[in-house]
Curated annotation (Swiss-Prot):
It is an enzyme of class 2 (transferase). This is Thymidylate kinase. The lineage of its organism: Bacteria, Bacillati, Mycoplasmatota, Mycoplasmoidales, Metamycoplasmataceae. HAMAP family: Thymidylate_kinase. InterPro entries: P-loop_NTPase (IPR027417), Thymidylate_kin-like_dom (IPR039430), Thymidylate_kinase (IPR018094). It comes from Mycoplasmopsis synoviae (strain 53). It holds the Pfam family Thymidylate_kin. ATP binds at G7, L8, D9, G10, S11, G12, K13, T14. It comes from the Bacteria.
Amino acid sequence: MFITFEGLDGSGKTTVINELLKKLKDNFKFLDYVLTREPGGKDIKESEKIREMILDSDLEFSPITEALLYTTSRRIHIDKVILPALAQNKIVFCDRYYDSFYAYQGYGRNLGMEFTKTLTELAVGKTIPNLTFFFDISPFETRKRRSENNLINDRLELEDLSFHNRVYEGYLEIIKNNKENRFVVVDATKPVNEIVDFIFNYLVKHKDFVKFLK
């Protein structure tokens, strides 16, 4: 089973993912899973080097170059992490996947859905998530959070508010137009423990997820 988590930078998803996995392991000690993320991947030096380039605030790329870097990193990640884990019947939890690409590059960078979908179809093939949790919180609130917590901003996080507004609106459009009904919208303004409980309770009742519980 392939589960992804999406949302703006500062939405709290990475913190929630880590707490969620702790709770799952506490309750289901033999749960077999892989935790990974994009851009980059789990211990994959090639895609991690691309990640460093993409997020380096000292480097500049055209939107198309950036999109090609993301796509290359994604294919490496699929080949070396996602597909092998799924072949071993493990659950894959992934912090960001191609929905981020659509939102950030398609909408944020104004490359459009046709262009980003073409690249995604080439890179991804049939490796589509079974379930995606979207952390819903406004760009204004995420900026406020990052400022209050003195978080270091990478190259994308340094973009102005209009960029992040486009990304947010892009996510909403992607969810609205999704034909696979795989999205679960999470209120990311709630406390971390409430979000963790919500996702945990959703998963343990999900018909595909329960097959992995021991």
